[in-house]
């Protein structure tokens, strides 16, 4: 039978998250990472396999990279946005516009999850299910906020580690995934991504 509490791929994300928070505990910072593209406050991150599949090089613009990534959505695929940003009506509306742009162009199913809450539900399917998802993870510069009792890191650092850890597992599973990190105004950046997705920019 099916054990609804068996979530091996959720545990894999937890393991990667713990590695990152342990690193912060020891060094006072998360491991360094290098963006593939940075443009006007939006940085794109992905592993070597996705970078190669997207044909990224020094001349690739952010718009080109996003369009190429969305162009990987084929018949039978779904598109998922994994948003590690504040869950509010403004952000949800901006993310919905991106989903609607993909839906109107491709006709594929789309879904949205706010992290880290989705990790214990759809997060298992994304990593342990069929490889028919195309993912865009969205993160931003959160205020570090309240410290975790007994630890050197804050809940903001934990959230960042959860996002990076989950993305690492998606990469390990060979998923088509990128991360867009927003350093400035989140709503304006999402609007820009929506324009790119709809082909208006």
Locations of regions flagged by a protein language model:
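Phosphate-moiety recognition in structured ligand-binding domains
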Residues: 1-201
